[in-house]
């Protein structure tokens, strides 16, 4: 008989995952193993466990190259994976836990796998003449890790790999890129500091270039009182060319056993060229008589057509711009540890940046109710220079064994100088080589801003008993701003001094090795940008005018959150429960005014009555026997918020808008039931997103639903592997009719391994039935919008990968 290896064990307060307990194909990567760990999930490119971010380490050192590098390393290098709370540098000096800790997933590397090179080279061909070439090389070492990366593709991928992070994302809806980087780190220990963080020096140089483009369709409805409603449809095509070289160097070192220094220097330059083509139309409809019309139908409508009589505006805009960004950043810190009682540190940074932009606009506008049209040529040149520097001091001290105190004071100064020259012409005779020559006095802008900020923070960790930590915190912020501001006819000098107070408290209770909970409360104040409180009037877009609001006030919020975590090791169950409450006070919303004769909107920021939101969550993960796994992530939200109904045909600046209440009930669920054997893996899944919106004006009520139910199947018949995914994606309740209904989503993948699994030939077919499209939606108490975007799908690609994984030395 062969004993079953448990997936999870405990060693003190450390959770230990055993790689042998997980079904992996030969040659699998580390990320494939980590995805299978109970409770671990990836969101927005980052790893989380029990809804808390994970800091990746290897043999107790930060993983050189960041989280994404685990996709290049073979899973067989891992002897154990340990999940634990890593104490702060101060805690390791004093022996007292100050509560400042990171949740770490530490990969323990098997003997014989260090000081070797790992990597791969990949060549890919994709239908419609797309390609990708990629090369990774990484030296796995505790002392001198290195990383080299090169790629070129026209398959819409931008991959950026540096010593601290990795980005792998779509460029846009379509695109091409080239990128290269080299990264080096040297690690060592100062005598007498082996129990603390290692000294390290890093250097990185990289150069990236990309071209990206996309077409986005959008529909927008701004909420009106019980009058004629309006509905706007638009389409935007954009293109961007970008090149960005950058260099970075970092140093952290113990000069002796009680002093550390750290320095980071980073320099970058970025140049981009952009074009935008916009088409749009708006039409009116009576309440409860909505009928969707596409943009093409609106643009094609002619006098006599029923739709033409309802049209309000149509527009076609073309924009081109060139932009340069320069940035130099240096931060520095010194910390001195005072025996077993605390530490004193000085920290600061200086940043110098500059930006300049030249932009041309060409607008064709139709005001159908006024039976007139116009063409507008615009050009502006914008220049921005900024200097920011900050210096702070921190004193940390333990009052006995149970009370820790931290006092920090930071002083920051910034100087920003922004200027914009603006030219506008309606007469083509004044346009020379596409550039207007008449100065537009209404949109010339300049702003010289000086900001002084002092932030005093007092925080503490109180440990009445070993298992309980109480961590109160209080911040006092004093902000003084001076602005010499000009926009059109507005020419003013303003000085504002603001003070904000931000209290918070965090309670953490480790009831046992397998049970813990935390409770937190935080109160925040947001001061509106000084410029938004000026009475400026931006008429760059004749159809959408933006203004400031001198009556704008501070907004506030407070959030209370509770988390509970429990494990049953023998039953291989991980359970997480969460609840939170958020209250907004005087939040800032957008108030729209509308002229029904021209179809022109005017907007300004305005404080609105506050709302609140309750959120409840359940995360459940269980291994059932040797082969089965059940996972469910469920969240319930109920929220209330307020917005303003649009003011229609009322030019009185003191007009009082009507409040509109939005009530939202939301359910999100991610369910998986999987079977994992050596040769077969099957997963049944269901993803649910449902929101119920209710308004004071019932004609705006809606309940959008998205549900995806399907199956993932993987078959391993060495040297072949086959993967198939089928899902029914269903949407309903959207104003854009094309978004609603069932869509059969599908993809398939087959691979062939040879040369002792060093070579991999694979064929991937995406969206076999050509049903996919990218949708997005946003609903507020004053507006709702829905959009769709193009991206690469319905393709086949053939790729070849060669891996040069090192093998452990035989003893």
Model-predicted segments: where are they?
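Primarily recognizes Gram-negative and organellar outer-membrane beta-barrels
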Residues: 62, 66-67, 87-129, 144-751, ...
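Short, polar/charged loop or turn motifs at beta-strand boundaries
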Residues: 14-36, 50, 57-66, 122-127, ...
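Short, acidic, small-residue-rich periplasmic hinge/interaction motif at the N-terminus
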Residues: 1-23, 42-44, 51, 84-85, ...
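Periplasmic plug
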Residues: 43-91, 104-111
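Extracytoplasmic
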Residues: 12-14, 51-53, 76-78, 100-104, ...
